[in-house]
Amino acid sequence: EQYELEVTEQEITIYGADARSFIYALNYLSETYLGVLPFWFWNDQKMEVKSYVEIPCGTYHSEADRIRYRGWFINDEVLISHWTAGVSKDYPWEMVFEALLRCGGNLVIPGTDKNSRIYAPIASDMGLMITHHHAEPLGAEMFLRAYPDLEPSYLKHKDLFEGLWKDAIGRQKDEEVIWNIGFRGQGDVPFWENDSAFDTSEKRGELISNIMKKQYAMVREQIPDAVFCTNLYGEILELYREGCLQIPEDVILIWADNGYGKMVSRRQGNHNPRVSAVPGGG
């Protein structure tokens, strides 16, 4: 993703290893010499028309980023889902993705449920890698969206769950994806809220661990060099801290705050254990 600029009196030449290299180079020129800020749209920046811009001759090398995958998730996306900003429903999302690129980001969760199907191709076309919400492993369609009349039980409908995962892999296998693995209940809750058979941490962790291994293997079968992540969020963090989860060694662990900036597990109803969400337990 690094780039090199060569500036002479006649021209500017950009060298880059991939598409994002050129995007970052153009954004650097845009901000440094035209004054366009990363959040220009969100801050209502007033643009200044320039008749002349002087860019010094010479060579500029960008620095390598210290963090390989850098991005964000658009939480509470319903707040912009029906906003057009006077242009179109897609436009605010395009501005979200542009701001991320201008900040040096390269990875995004482009919405959830129906939104993820709509905006993932746009984010990808704009140069971003895609990953998935923790309630939608592999970016698969929610079970109750696909099968609204069935009980969303993995034990009862294993083949249907795995069919949704297979479809998601096939749909995205040619894109740049960081594959999120895991298992939560429908509606973004612990899966055992609707299945009393899983009444201990050991039983819950065993099922989630087995599912993650299955998802991992399904992706690896089609994409040998795939990159994976999982979210240590809520009940998943608790199970991990208790030693009840077995996660493949090369899966990136995403440590989540509680939604209020504290690195502890998020409260769910009256359950608020405040388990540390700092790597190493600090």
Give the ranges of each region predicted by the language model:
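The substrate-binding groove and active-site-proximal loops of carbohydrate-active enzymes
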Residues: T13-G16, N75-D90, C103-G111, L144-E162, ...
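Structured mid-domain segments that build the active-site/substrate or prosthetic-cofactor binding neighborhood
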Residues: L101, N106-G111, H134, D257-G259, ...
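Contiguous, structured surface segment used for ligand recognition
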Residues: E1-A64
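Catalytic domains of carbohydrate-active enzymes, especially glycoside hydrolases
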Residues: S88-I118, I122-D125, M129-T131, D174
